[in-house]
Amino acid sequence: MQLVDRVRGAVTGMSRRLVVGAVGAALVSGLVGAVGGTATAGAFSRPGLPVEYLQVPSPSMGRDIKVQFQSGGANSPALYLLDGLRAQDDFSGWDINTPAFEWYDQSGLSVVMPVGGQSSFYSDWYQPACGKAGCQTYKWETFLTSELPGWLQANRHVKPTGSAVVGLSMAASSALTLAIYHPQQFVYAGAMSGLLDPSQAMGPTLIGLAMGDAGGYKASDMWGPKEDPAWQRNDPLLNVGKLIANNTRVWVYCGNGKPSDLGGNNLPAKFLEGFVRTSNIKFQDAYNAGGGHNGVFDFPDSGTHSWEYWGAQLNAMKPDLQRALGATPNTGPAPQGA
């Protein structure tokens, strides 16, 4: 409270609500940065798993994109795992922090982990993504829904349709958005601990602050000013009716900021999970009010914004993913590229 009091005293002619809101925005930005930069488990895929490190051409982004891949067998559906705000350029956070490849080995699902995309929201940006490390083109939606599935079909025998996309934190809303606009490719969307109403209220401001902290990026380069229709297009709450109409299978998880024996007992992880929970509950309410009947909503009385909980959710959803995607578990060798 001392920080808030100092700011209140320093600013005149500004309402209490605006001052506290500004401080809250700055605080959330710092917390997002702190959480996004923490690798907890350091799992990495064990030696012996059939994990490949692919370089997939992306004409839309003008470079090759690194993809970690584990085959689920010929003509298998894919499970795309999307990373958080501070996605690294060397390995996916899913591999760094969870044994996801181990869990899904021989599952009948091809596991696809795109690497990179810090602060991207896995979206097609209006402008070049310019940050502290320079400028690059972000056309992640095009890559994930056109270039990558086409390449995987041709080179790794992966089905281009009937797949799943799962994202955490930043990528939770991205996963739902990709399923909204690409329902044939993604018949299943999993969202963990995300802000599911990003265009609402302080959402654009908070996202902009977080992106600035995580790489020095600008939200306006991504979706323009907050009045731009791109913000509404990428808002799962506003577009929940499309998920219902598509009968997309959804799995939405968010804790309440209280740690359990899984861990994550630190202030940033506790605060941020509690902060985003409200938008998840609003999303469930809108889904139910719209007549949705193909979803799993898990809002336990514990859970913080950390990998221990996201890993547990990914492991828990495995049977549901296999059922929904019609995966056939296999024990034979993975097919090699053409």
UniProtKB/Swiss-Prot annotation:
Top-rank taxon: Bacteria
This protein's name: Diacylglycerol acyltransferase/mycolyltransferase Ag85A
InterPro entries: AB_hydrolase_fold (IPR029058), Esterase-like (IPR000801), Mycobacterial_A85_antigen (IPR050583), TAT_signal (IPR006311)
PANTHER family, sorted: DIACYLGLYCEROL ACYLTRANSFERASE_MYCOLYLTRANSFERASE AG85A, ENTEROCHELIN ESTERASE-RELATED
Consequence of gene loss (knockout): Cells lacking this gene produce normally mycoloylated cell wall components.
Protein's organism: Mycobacterium tuberculosis (strain ATCC 25618 / H37Rv)
UniProt: substrate binding residues: L85, R86, S169, D197, F275, V276, R277, T278, K282, H305, S306, W307
Disulfide bond annotation, renumbered to this chain: C130-C135
Location of the active site: S169, E273, H305
The reaction(s) this protein catalyses: an acyl-CoA + a 1,2-diacyl-sn-glycerol = a triacyl-sn-glycerol + CoA; 2 alpha,alpha'-trehalose 6-mycolate = alpha,alpha'-trehalose 6,6'-bismycolate + alpha,alpha-trehalose
Purpose: The antigen 85 proteins (FbpA, FbpB, FbpC) are responsible for the high affinity of mycobacteria for fibronectin, a large adhesive glycoprotein, which facilitates the attachment of M.tuberculosis to murine alveolar macrophages (AMs). They also help to maintain the integrity of the cell wall by catalyzing the transfer of mycolic acids to cell wall arabinogalactan, and through the synthesis of alpha,alpha-trehalose dimycolate (TDM, cord factor).
Family: Belongs to the mycobacterial A85 antigen family.
Pfam families assigned to the protein according to its UniProt record, in alphabetical order: Esterase
Subunit organization: Homodimer.
GO molecular function: acyltransferase activity, transferring groups other than amino-acyl groups; diacylglycerol O-acyltransferase activity; trehalose O-mycolyltransferase activity; zymogen binding
Extra remark beyond the main annotation: Was identified as a high-confidence drug target.
Subcellular localization: Secreted, Cell wall; Cytoplasm
GO cellular component, one term: extracellular region
